[in-house]
Amino acid sequence: MNPVNYLYLAALLFTIGATGVLIRRNAIVVFMCIELMLNACNLAFVAFSRMHGNLDGQIIAFFTMVVAAAEVVVGLAIIVSLFRSRHSASVDDASLMKL
C-alpha cells in the first residue's frame, strides 16, 4: 500500500475524531475521540517516517503512545470522579466541579 494512502486514512480518522469532540457531550465519547485523533497523528508520523526512510517518526509515535497511556489513566479518573459526584458523564457538568 502506498504511504500516501496511510496519510489519507490518518486525515480521515483525525476528522472523525475532531467531529466527535465538537458534536458529542458525553465525556467518555469525547475522550475516545481525542484518543482517535492522537492515533491518527501517530499513523501520520509512521507514514512520514516510512516515506523518508528514517525511524524518527516511529520513535515519536512510540513515545506518544506512552504518554497516551498515562493520559488514559488520568482522564478516566477525572471522568469517574465526575460521574460519582454528578451522576452524569456530560461534559457540561465538568465546569461545576470544584477543587
Curated annotation (Swiss-Prot):
GO BP annotations listed: ATP synthesis coupled electron transport
InterPro entries, per database record: NADH_UbQ_OxRdtase_chain4L/K, NUOK/Mnh_C1-like
GO cellular component: NADH dehydrogenase complex; plasma membrane
Signal among keywords: no
GO molecular function: NADH:ubiquinone reductase (non-electrogenic) activity; quinone binding
Topology of the protein relative to the lipid bilayer: Multi-pass membrane protein
Keyword Transport: yes
Catalytic reaction(s) noted: a quinone + NADH + 5 H(+)(in) = a quinol + NAD(+) + 4 H(+)(out)
Source organism, top-level taxon: Bacteria
The EC number(s) this enzyme carries: 7.1.1.-
Subcellular localization: Cell membrane
Spans traversing the lipid bilayer: 3-23, 28-48, 59-79
UniProt keyword terms in alphabetical order: Cell membrane, Membrane, NAD, Quinone, Translocase, Transmembrane, Transmembrane helix, Transport
Oligomeric and partner information: NDH-1 is composed of 14 different subunits. Subunits NuoA, H, J, K, L, M, N constitute the membrane sector of the complex.
Protein family per UniProt: Belongs to the complex I subunit 4L family.
Purpose: NDH-1 shuttles electrons from NADH, via FMN and iron-sulfur (Fe-S) centers, to quinones in the respiratory chain. The immediate electron acceptor for the enzyme in this species is believed to be a menaquinone. Couples the redox reaction to proton translocation (for every two electrons transferred, four hydrogen ions are translocated across the cytoplasmic membrane), and thus conserves the redox energy in a proton gradient.
Protein name as it appears in the record: NADH-quinone oxidoreductase subunit K 2
Species in which this protein is naturally found: Streptomyces coelicolor (strain ATCC BAA-471 / A3(2) / M145)
Gene: nuoK2
